[in-house]
Swiss-Prot record:
Protein name: Ran-binding protein 10
Keywords on record: Acetylation, Cytoplasm, Nucleus, Phosphoprotein
Modification sites for Phosphoserine: S361, S365, S367, S369, S422, S451, S453
Protein's organism: Homo sapiens
Residue ranges with Gly residues bias: 18-28
Modified residues (Phosphotyrosine): Y362
Recorded name of the encoding gene: RANBP10
Length: 620
């Protein structure tokens, strides 16, 4: 970049400049925030982590006769300007992502300088910057002195009017049909180029002294109504999708769709709805109603935090399933430990009192309906082999590669509770024997549940499934620590400090004993299948809860959120289905995941129509 003294306007940033905020790791400036919002609105399909959008001119990708200022948005010429050999250009920081579908930027002519030999356009990486855009291969430009367009050639073609000081020239790239058109002062000038390649950079070139231009990559509203043009093309692309020819096999197509819907309902245990749908569409149900209801009952137990009962019920309905899926068993046991800390598992529920100091702050999962997004996360492995869940909490740590049934060696740092002597080995039936002591009223009410209402929980009085008193403790995943020295008499009686197991000594001892059994199970699995880092992390996370007097407000307290039960529930449900030779994921979700992945591949291949055919647009 040229020295500040050589740059007109240097030191006078304009509103929306990208250079001011965020320097030194600070917060983004209001201008940067507004730019981000506008770009997100214009190009919602672009993943800016993978393919950043152009936001300014590149100080590293320019000829040395070019000077930059005002957040690298202002370009001025500082060469001799004797002939075409003194031409100079600059490219934007990033190429235009194909996922934009339609991309637009504007350039304001601050001064035409001596002769107004200015070019605005596009160029590929590596094109000579000692030339105006359009003169070389993979370079395209609209020049102000004669109004000609230059398409990879030194010979221009008549295109539009000339432009000079005060004019605003826009450049629109249509990545759907590979064309480009320009605008002048908000009015379209028509198609200038066709058959454009992918990965082009916004480019401007200057040639004579005094020439100054300002770029607008979205920092300010555009003169041209680009959003109206985008709406037009969105309608065209979606019309193509809607008009896809299937009339020749309409009956077959309808049957496929009906089977997909039916299998989705069955997968998630909506027994009554699946039965009614099958009756209306004459679609066969691939699973017996009794089995669906059994899975429904098990899912309900997990989502209520009664994991020990869910394990026992699974062993009763599906003998051998957990014994042949040690990873799943270990995940369930870790989740059971978390729920014992939470006070919802019947192992401690019958021991601890339901006093105001009790830790049962989460009444149940706030939503039992599956959460779906348009991305390939539909295709994630929720089975027993998946290492991505830690106690049912989606891990943010680096992914590990594991064999089908690996397991960890014991970690001495997992918890003080695991340091005590434990059996040298423990078989699965023994490790599950602790689940047999359950409250009888739970099983009696479970037998009466026969419809989809089984899968509904009463969480209306608890926003997001959390008691109101929790809102002051957990905010956006940030846990506020309280001074443990505070005199309890000064605390608000309406919000007493919660204690592990409500302060019940017997329940606390039961948790510690269960932790030892869990440690022993981990060691046995480690001997049989080898070390498993995912298991080690599960133990460390779960046992860490015991290090805090108030686990719900500690840094690892998010494990206690009922929403973290859902990955465990999904893994168990998928394993049950797989054991019955049924798909572990419903075909509908696989189709959505495949569609999302296809759109990503289209973007990487430079097919811009992917931006206007988002899966989100078809999910209501």
């Amino acid at each position: 970049m040229a020295a500040a003294t050589a740059d007109p306007g240097a030191g006078n940033p304009q509103p929306g400049d990208s250079s001011g905020g965020g320097a030194g790791g600070g917060l983004p400036s209001p201008g940067e925030q507004e730019l981000s919002r506008r770009l997100q609105r214009l190009y919602p399909a672009v993943n800016q982590q993978e393919t950043p959008l152009p936001r300014s001119w590149s100080p590293k990708d320019k000829y040395n006769y070019i000077g930059l200022s005002q957040g690298n948005l202002r370009v001025h010429y500082k060469g001799h300007g004797k002939n075409h050999k003194d031409a100079a250009s600059v490219r934007a920081t990033h190429p235009i992502p194909a996922a934009c579908g339609i991309y637009y930027f504007e350039v304001k002519i601050v001064s035409k300088g001596r002769d107004g030999y200015m070019g605005i356009g596009l160029s590929a990486q590596g094109v000579n910057m000692n030339r105006l855009p359009g003169w070389d291969k993979h370079s395209y430009g609209y020049h102000g002195d004669d109004g000609h367009s230059f398409c990879s050639s030194g010979t221009g073609q008549p295109y539009g009017p000339t432009f000079t000081t005060g004019d605003v020239i826009g450049c629109c790239v249509n990545l759907i049909n590979g064309t480009c058109f320009y605008t002048k002062n908000g009015h379209s000038l028509g198609i200038a180029f066709t058959d454009l390649p992918a990965n082009l950079y916004p480019t401007v070139g200057l040639q004579t002294p005094g020439e100054i231009v300002d770029a607008n990559f979205g920092q300010q509203p555009f003169l041209f109504d680009i959003e109206d043009y985008m709406r037009e093309w969105r309608a065209k692309v979606q019309g193509t999708v809607h008009c896809f020819p299937i009339s020749a096999r309409l009956g077959e197509w309808q049957a496929v769709l009906q089977n997909m819907v039916s299998s989705y309902l069955v997968h998630h245990g909506y027994c009554a709805t699946a039965t009614a749908f099958a009756r209306m569409t004459e679609t066969p149900i691939q699973e017996e109603q009794a089995s669906i209801k059994n899975r429904q009952k098990i899912q309900k137990l997990v989502l209520e935090g009664r994991v020990g009962e869910a394990i026992e019920t699974t062993q009763r309905f599906y003998p051998g399933l957990l014994e042949h899926n040690p990873n799943l068993l270990f995940m369930l046991k870790c989740r059971q430990f978390v729920e014992m800390v939470n006070g919802t598992d019947s192992e401690v529920r019958s021991l601890s009192s339901r006093s105001p100091k009790s830790q049962d702050s989460y009444p149940g999962s706030p939503s039992l309906s599956p959460r779906h997004g348009p991305s390939s996360s539909h295709m994630h492995n929720t089975g027993a082999d998946s290492p991505s869940c830690s106690n049912g909490v989606a891990s943010t740590k680096s992914k590990q590669n594991h064999s089908k049934y690996p397991a960890p060696s014991s970690s001495s740092s997992s918890s003080s509770s695991s340091s005590s002597s434990s059996p040298s080995s423990v078989n699965y039936s023994e490790s599950n024997s602790t689940d047999s002591t359950k409250s009888q009223h739970h099983s009696s009410t479970s037998n009466q549940e026969t419809s989809d209402s089984e899968m509904e929980m009463e969480a209306e009085h608890y926003p997001n499934g959390v008691l109101g008193s929790m809102s002051t403790r957990i905010v956006n995943g940030a846990y506020k620590h309280e001074d443990l020295q505070t005199d309890e008499s000064s605390m608000d009686d309406r919000h007493p400090r919660r204690q592990l197991c409500g302060g019940n000594q017997a329940a606390t001892e039961r948790i510690i004993l269960f932790g030892r059994e869990l440690q022993a199970l981990s060691e046995q699995l480690g001997r049989e299948y080898g070390k498993n880092l995912a298991h080690t992390e599960m133990l460390q996370d779960a046992f860490s809860l015991l290090a805090y007097s108030d686990p719900w407000s500690c840094p690892v307290g998010q494990q206690l959120d009922p929403i973290q039960r859902e990955p465990v529930c999904a893994a168990l449900n998928s394993a049950i289905l797989e054991s019955q030779n049924l798909p572990k994921q419903p075909p509908l979700m696989l189709a959505l995941g495949q569609a999302s992945e296809c759109l990503r591949l289209m973007a990487r291949a430079g097919l811009g129509s992917c931006s206007f055919a988002r899966v989100d647009d078809y999910l209501h």
